[in-house]
Design a protein with these regions (language model features):
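Active-site phosphate/ATP/adenylate-binding loop shared across adenylate-forming ligases
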Residues: 1-237
Length: 237
């Protein structure tokens, strides 16, 4: 029995919603904007731009100017120090660290619980739903998923927040049930020392039936190369 066929059926209802994106994209985007504006209306940022009186995209466009990260940075620094209800109403404790492509400085991007659930995790589920539609005979769930991410650490300047790669934040906060169908363990996945981490992941993964890969392609290539070296094989298939 192909267990993937059974599990993939749970994604069918979501596919119907995804299909609406192609026919009602504009309406959906306006709905999302209105919802976000309403939710953030009582934050310091929302009050500054009088979000409570915004009724349309045109209102938002005229009221809220395009701004750079440097202009928003003071709010981010206050959030990292423990202040809340500045840019978003729910508690912000996680900050994703960018690679610093602008001004050669890393940026700290606030990550709310809503962003995790409604964007990142839902996006992953949507990608899986579309994959199963295109590949109905997939054996995705017949083995485990190899997930390769970065690491995170406490904010050295404040005990109110944690900083890390977005991938590490996703691994740390994912539904615990995922731990039963993925490798490596969370402890290994979040190691900060890269060489030690690659060795640990390779050693824990080699004996496992891996049926999917998730992670930054360049990082994954390094890991796969190491696994091939350790097993003296030419292919992972």
């Amino acid at each position: 029995m192909n267990i993937t066929k059974i599990i993939s059926k749970t994604f069918d209802s979501r596919l119907k919603q995804i299909d609406l994106y192609a026919t009602q994209a504009s309406e959906i985007q306006h709905s999302v904007l209105n919802r976000l504006v309403h939710q953030a209306a009582q934050t310091e940022w929302g009050k500054k731009y009088d979000y409570s009186s915004i009724r349309s995209y045109e209102d938002f466009r005229k009221r809220v100017p395009i701004q750079t990260y440097e202009e928003i940075k003071p709010y981010v620094e206050r959030l990292r120090a423990g202040e809340q209800n500045l840019l978003w109403p729910s508690e912000i404790r996680w900050f994703a660290k960018s690679s610093g492509t602008t001004n050669d400085k890393s940026k700290f991007l606030p990550v709310s619980k809503e962003a995790l659930q409604d964007i990142h995790y839902r996006g992953g589920k949507d990608a899986a739903a579309l994959y199963f539609r295109i590949n109905p005979d997939s054996h995705f769930f017949s083995g485990k998923g190899l997930i390769l991410g970065g690491s995170h650490s406490p904010n050295l300047n404040s005990n109110h927040s944690l900083v890390g790669d977005l991938s590490a934040i996703l691994i740390q906060n994912v539904n615990p049930l995922i731990n039963f169908v993925r490798v490596p363990s969370k402890k290994i996945a979040l190691m900060s020392e890269w060489e030690t981490k690659i060795e640990a992941i390779a050693n824990s993964t080699i004996p496992v039936n891996v049926t999917s890969l998730s992670g930054v392609p360049s990082w994954m290539l390094v890991l796969i190369k190491r696994i091939l070296e350790k097993t003296d094989r030419k292919s992972v298939v």
